[in-house]
C-alpha cells in the first residue's frame, strides 16, 4: 500500500499547530495526527501590538523536528496563516521594524482617507476586496507615514505564510490567495495594482508577482539531511478551510468559524456590483481560479476575550449554563469596530447593551449568551445578503474550523438562518493545506476530488433548523417588523 506523509503548519491568531497527514492512495483515506500545538497571541512592543514571529518560527521548527525524530519520511510541507499582516526584510533578508498585528490602532482613520482620495467605488472595482480598517493597504500607508525612517532599509515585504516559508527555504514567494486579502491585488490582472500601491506608499519592488497555489517554493533541509519540498498551499487559512469544506452543489454556503467567522460561497466570477459594494462583500482568491465571495464577521474573538478576562477554563460548563438561559435578551453587533481590540471586552459588550437600552449581561453565561445569539443573528443577516447578491437561496450551510465544535452555536445558527447546517471538519484549514500538497504530489486531481476524500473521512454532524425555537421566533418577528416598515415607507 502506498502512503504519503504531508505536514501542515497551520497558524491562527490564537494558536498554531503542526499536523501530520497520512494519505493511503489505494483506499483514498486521510488521517491526521497532531504533532505540536502552541499558543499564539498579541504582544505589546515599543507602543505597537505585534506578533512574536521568532517564537512562532521556533515552534514550527520544533514540530517539524519531532516528525523527523520519529523516522517518518516527509513528502511535503505547507504553511497557512491569517491574512493581511506582513514582515519587512532588508537586502540581506534581515527584519526591518516590527511585525505589527492587524489589531494595532496605527491604521485608525486611514480607510476613510483612502476612500475620499481614491474613491470608494474605484478601490472596490480594482481590488474586489471588502473595506476593513486593518487591510494591508492601510497598514502600509500607516508604516510609510509614521515610520519613514524605515523605508530606505526595506527591500522585501512578505505576508506571514510567505515569511515562514522563506525562513525554512531561503526562497521568497507571494502566494495569491493570501495576497488578495491585502486589498492591493488587481482583480482583473491578479497582480499588484500600481495605483493602490502608490497610495499605500509602498514600493512595487518589495513584492514579487503573486503565484497560485500548487508550486514548490523551495526545500527545507531536515536534521537528517533530506531535502523536503515546501509547497505554496492556499496560504490564507480561510482559503485552505474552504478547500476542505465538503460543499455539495451550487446551493451550499460555508462558514469558517474561529477567531473570525467568514461566511460565503464559491464562484467562478467575482461580484463587484453596487449591491456587493453596499454589503461590503469581499472577493478573495481561492484555489483553481475560484473566488471566495464572503463577508468577515468578528467571530469567536469576543468569546476568547471574555474567557481570558473572566479566567474561565471550563468552556463546556459555560456553554451548558448558557444553553439554560432564554435567548435574545442581549443583542449586540459583533462587527462593530469597538470590538476589534477593546481594553476590556466584557465592559465593551455591557456598554453596547446599555447604550441600546437593553438588560446588561453580568454573569459569565449571560455574556456568552449575548455573544452566541448575536453571532447567530448576524449569520442569518449575512446569509440573506449573500443569497440576494447571487439571486438564489442556499440549501445548506457548512460550518468548518474549531468553532464548529460549539454545538449550541451550530443549532442557533441553523434556527436563525432556517437552514440545514453540516458541522465539520474541525481542522479544515489543516486539511485544505494538505489537499493542495497532495495535488502538488499528483495524488489527487483537483479540489472537488479532494472534497470527496474529506466527505468520506471527516466526522460531520447535521443540525436541523427548529422553527419553534426562541431565536427562530425572534428572527420571524424582526422580518415582520421590517416588512411593515417597508410597506409604510
Swiss-Prot record:
Q: Select a single GO molecular function from the record's annotations and give it.
A: glycerol kinase activity
List required co-factors. Answer: Mg(2+)
EC number(s) recorded for this UniProt protein? 2.7.1.5
UniProt entry tagged with the keyword Membrane: no
Q: Which Gene3D superfamilies match?
A: 3.30.420.40
Write down the CDD domains for this protein, in alphabetical order: ASKHA_NBD_FGGY_RhaB-like (cd07771)
Taxonomy, superkingdom = Bacteria
Active site (record annotation): 237
Residues binding substrate, per UniProt: 83, 236-238, 296
Q: Note whether Lipid metabolism occurs among the keywords.
A: no
Listed GO cellular component terms?
cytosol
Among InterPro entries, the record links this protein to: ATPase_NBD, FGGY_C, FGGY_N, Rhamnulokinase
Pathway(s) of this molecule = Carbohydrate degradation; L-rhamnose degradation; glycerone phosphate from L-rhamnose: step 2/3
Q: What are the record keywords, sorted?
A: ATP-binding, Disulfide bond, Kinase, Magnesium, Nucleotide-binding, Rhamnose metabolism, Transferase
What pairs make up the disulfide bonds? 68-222, 353-370, 413-417
The record lists ATP as bound by 13-17, 259, 304, 402
Give the record's GO biological process terms. Answer: glycerol metabolic process; rhamnose catabolic process
Q: Which reaction is this enzyme known to catalyze? A: L-rhamnulose + ATP = L-rhamnulose 1-phosphate + ADP + H(+)
Instruction: Give the HAMAP family listed for this entry.
Output: Rhamnulokinase
The free-text function statement in the UniProt record for this protein reads: Involved in the catabolism of L-rhamnose (6-deoxy-L-mannose). Catalyzes the transfer of the gamma-phosphate group from ATP to the 1-hydroxyl group of L-rhamnulose to yield L-rhamnulose 1-phosphate.
NCBIfam families hit by this protein: PRK10640.1 (NF007925), rhamnulo_kin (TIGR02627)
State the family it belongs to.
Belongs to the rhamnulokinase family.
What protein name does the entry list?
Answer: Rhamnulokinase
